[in-house]
Amino acid sequence: MKYASFLALVGFITSTSAIGVSGAAEGFAKGVTGGGSATPVYPSTTAELVSYLTDSQPRVIVLTKTFDFTNTEGSTTATGCAPWGTAPGCQLAINQNDWCKNYQSSAPSVSVTYDNAGVLGMTVASDKTLLGSGSSGVIKGKGLRVVSGAKNIIIQNVAITDINPKYVWGGDAITIDNADMVWIDHVTTARIGRQHLVLGTSASNRVTISNSYFNGVSSYSATCDGYHYWGIYLTGSNDLVTMKGNYIHHFSGRSPKIQGNTLLHAVNNYWYDSTGHAFEIGSGGYVLAEGNVFQNIKTIVEPPVGGQLFTSPNSNTNQACSAYLGHVCQVNGFGSSGPFSQADTGLLSKFSGKNVASASAYTVAQSRVPSSAGQGKL
């Protein structure tokens, strides 16, 4: 009996000591440590998870199950609108801040019933690591918010799903706004009402998004075709964003939209299957795209480009990257996709002196990303 107890104790210690962040952030959030060497904690209830995320202590928070927030804060029935029609596959809109009245005044009014927990995500305080264990760490019905000066945060190997998918303004999966040093890695998002990822108008500074799976398959969409429109929105006033090794699948727009004052390094990602556009670049959006794969993307970048774009068009032009990124930029790969050729070399100097992610040939992303991105793929 004592021997069996000893073995159980050894097993627990081994399991606990093995918990930790896998790898390290590349690119702009290089050096992020999250909760560091804090003793791991294992929430068992939604309330306990919220408490660990919001307190002032450095934390390593390990998720070993699904935390379902559905119905934890009740529901609301109200009058919304139907900007894209009332067909079964069309999203409806919650009238948040009189959005229907101010922006969709001609849309018919409809009754909407949504889950309150999804509308506003959980706040994540500074110095936190949020880790999923294996394929078990799931947050359902509520997102995460890194805001109000929060910094030094790692979110790894977690799935965020089912946030009022029928309704625009039903909630975002991950919000970052007025933050710094945030690393999102091996995260899966699916069936989200609004944005899968949004960086708000305040400065979010240094952010790396890597090896994540943004899944746009949905029963409801603004384009009424099962392709989610509200993908990734980067609109901060002073943002440096690295996107590397992500799988961006089944969207019809905003994947990503970039504006404000945002420098995006999109490297070795895989865009697959879009009925609309991938990039939407507004004023103040600066995008360098290299070593990516675009497969079945009808419109890679929506015209006109309001900011600046360097698409790494050919080996000769790509030599210009060396002086600022420390490597020759890699060409992108295309299959059944629209054109993507622009070379605003002036934006390259913005990378000078910064932590820049390495780049591989697009064939590496083509072979690895679909099978390695997202939760449970560490």
From Swiss-Prot:
Keyword annotations of the record: Carbohydrate metabolism, Cell wall biogenesis/degradation, Disulfide bond, Lyase, Polysaccharide degradation, Secreted, Signal
SMART domains: Amb_all
Domain of life the protein comes from: Eukaryota
Paired cysteines (S-S): C81-C100, C90-C224, C321-C329
Keyword Disulfide bond appears in the UniProt entry: yes
Cellular localization per UniProt: Secreted
One GO term of the biological process aspect: cell wall organization
Sample GO molecular function, one term: pectate lyase activity
Function: Pectinolytic enzymes consist of four classes of enzymes: pectin lyase, polygalacturonase, pectin methylesterase and rhamnogalacturonase. Among pectinolytic enzymes, pectin lyase is the most important in depolymerization of pectin, since it cleaves internal glycosidic bonds of highly methylated pectins.
Family: Belongs to the polysaccharide lyase 1 family.
Descriptive protein name: Probable pectin lyase A
Organism in which the protein naturally occurs: Aspergillus clavatus (strain ATCC 1007 / CBS 513.65 / DSM 816 / NCTC 3887 / NRRL 1 / QM 1276 / 107)
